Amino acid sequence: MAAYSYRPGPGAGPGPAAGAALPDQSFLWNVFQRVDKDRSGVISDNELQQALSNGTWTPFNPVTVRSIISMFDRENKAGVNFSEFTGVWKYITDWQNVFRTYDRDNSGMIDKHELKQALSGFGYRLSDQFHDILIRKFDRQGRGQIAFDDFIQGCIVLQRLTDIFRRYDTDQDGWIQVSYEQYLSMVFSIV
């Protein structure tokens, strides 16, 4: 058996709070049509990736794009229709606002100190060593900082892991006891 700890804070869980209102539907429809290159009525992960900017002149993380599409694709069509796209638009816009809030030096990147503030703001109480692990895991450019798209991905993964942990933390004391196979099941449901 293995034990793992998480100290839940109030409302712990990364993610943007309810953000700004959506732009008008005609604006979003025009954006949708520009992104839907093949005119299928569905934006694929490749189309969305090409349309997104992470602010570093590198392609948006394809894993992040697939994660976002899977959250909003209610019909398992490997893409989002216009109705679902409005949710994607709001989700990404809300994340941009969160990112800008914690990017205190306006570098377009989140460093370890800014990440710690962001996660603390989400209710997480994690060690400096764990913040180092997150930076190493989600820093695709090897600069000790996380770009916007990788910040989203890191928060998505952290939330999924936290959700799984909470299912096993029945007494909500921040400790769980799981068998090796349960542990593997938890990990493989994320990767």
Swiss-Prot record:
GO CC terms: COPII vesicle coat; Cul3-RING ubiquitin ligase complex; cytoplasm; cytoplasmic vesicle; cytosol; endoplasmic reticulum; endoplasmic reticulum exit site; endoplasmic reticulum membrane
A molecular function GO annotation: calcium ion binding
Binding site for Ca(2+) 2: 103, 105, 107, 109, 114
Presence of the UniProt keyword Repeat in the record: yes
SMART domains, sorted: EFh
InterPro entries: EF-hand-dom_pair, EF_Hand_1_Ca_BS, EF_hand_dom, Peflin/Sorcin_CaBP
Gene Ontology BP term (one): intracellular protein transport
Gene3D superfamilies: EF-hand
Residue span, EF-hand domain: 23-58, 59-89, 90-125, 126-161, 162-191
Location(s), subcellular: Endoplasmic reticulum membrane; Cytoplasmic vesicle, COPII-coated vesicle membrane; Cytoplasm; Nucleus
Chain sites annotated for binding Mg(2+): 169, 171, 173, 175
Binding site for Ca(2+) 1: 36, 38, 40, 42, 47
Annotated membrane topology: Peripheral membrane protein
Signal sequence residues: none
N-acetylalanine: residues carrying this PTM: 2
Keywords for this protein: Acetylation, Angiogenesis, Apoptosis, Calcium, Cytoplasm, Cytoplasmic vesicle, Endoplasmic reticulum, Endosome, Magnesium, Membrane, Metal-binding, Nucleus, Repeat
Task performed by this protein: Calcium sensor that plays a key role in processes such as endoplasmic reticulum (ER)-Golgi vesicular transport, endosomal biogenesis or membrane repair. Acts as an adapter that bridges unrelated proteins or stabilizes weak protein-protein complexes in response to calcium: calcium-binding triggers exposure of apolar surface, promoting interaction with different sets of proteins thanks to 3 different hydrophobic pockets, leading to translocation to membranes. Involved in ER-Golgi transport.
Domain notes: Interacts with different set of proteins thanks to 3 different hydrophobic pockets. Hydrophobic pockets 1 and 2, which mediate interaction with PDCD6IP, are largely formed by residues from EF-hand 3 (EF3) to 5 (EF5), as well as by Tyr-180 (EF5) of a dimerizing molecule (Pocket 1) and from EF-hand (EF2) to 4 (EF4) (Pocket 2). Hydrophobic pocket 3, which mediates interaction with SEC31A, is mainly formed by residues from EF-hand 1 (EF1) to 3 (EF3).
Subunit composition and interactions: Homodimer and heterodimer; heterodimerizes (via the EF-hand 5) with PEF1. Isoform 1 and isoform 2 self-associate; probably forming homodimers. Interacts with CPNE4 (via VWFA domain). Interacts with PDCD6IP; the interaction is calcium-dependent. Interacts with RBM22. Interacts with PLSCR4. Interacts with ANXA7 and TSG101. Interacts with DAPK1. Interacts with SEC31A; the interaction is calcium-dependent and promotes monoubiquitination of SEC31A. Interacts with ANXA11 (via N-terminus); the interaction is calcium-dependent.
Protein name listed in UniProt: Programmed cell death protein 6
Origin species: Rattus norvegicus (Rat)
